[in-house]
């Protein structure tokens, strides 16, 4: 059973996912590059990520880091919550640190699994990981203040998902 999850992305959906998964009892690491370090500083200073609107409460992820090695190490699942134009960047950043058995879930997918697979092949990555995409986003949301996300509809942690190759879907769901 998955317990340790890394959420990549320090935008509104990444904040929402990190807070939601922390609320659900998972050990969450929140990661993005140094361009977003001030957001992690805000989360630390304010005692967590505050959810408003359709979700409520303040939740502190176990780890906030801009170090990809720290973010990926021992994560059982890696949720990628970034815009599609960052998929290649993220794939390249995490590739050297991947470990056998990890599940990479791209939300929303936008065919990102193909980008990740291409990058991993190009870089000669041999770790046995699954690549899965979730249809749609976790929830409509917006950063409304430092370390605060307003959620417009209930969080949809389920929805449709598929892996690449499709035969891996059963390993993930």
Language-model region placement:
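Short mixed-charge
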Residues: 47-61, 128
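Short beta-strand/turn micro-motifs composed of small residues
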Residues: 9, 32, 82, 108, ...
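Rossmann-like NAD(P)-binding element
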Residues: 55-105
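Rossmann-like NAD(P)(H) cofactor-binding subdomain of soluble oxidoreductases
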Residues: 84-147
